[in-house]
Amino acid sequence: MKKRWYDYLWIVSLTYLILGFFNILFAWLGLLCFFIPLIISIVKGTKGYCNRYCGRGQLFGILGGRFGLSRKADIPKWMKSKWFRYGFLIFFFLMFFQMLWNTGLVFAGAKDLGQVVTLLWTFKLPWHWAYHGTVFHQGVAQFAFGFYSVMLTSTVLGLVTMVLFKPRSWCVYCPMGTMTQLICKAKNREKE
């Protein structure tokens, strides 16, 4: 089967994670992974991003499938349940809004820039080598540290579930997938 350009988007996901090690401001590019799925689901009413363009899902598929890093076990029913998915979405939103709050505090001068990446919302990893100051306000860097934390945490969770279950198990409870699914359901209700 002939490969299409979007079959290589896993390279973009991997490159994004690598760039964040060298310059945290590249974390801003992750917003594309946030807005593009929403735009596609709002405009087209489909989960086209998840099914075709998600580089992270592709990366998990390659690592777990082609490289055999997955047990390929079925994901537990509770992880597929709407309660878990919606609960995880709410939890993710709370962590996202906390990140925005901290960014706002840095912009307001009420808090110093925290040059750390917080993994799994708990473990603060020093990341000072990835930021050397810029012409931008430190709040721009604070957002980058926070957003990279969210992206790295979701990647770690995806890798863990990839190893334990099927390669793309993360996709079952991915907050972006849950949001786009809700948008698609709402759009389909409008059509009726």
Task: Specify the residue positions occupied by each region the protein language model found.
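Non-ligating segments of multi-cofactor redox enzymes
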Residues: M1-E192
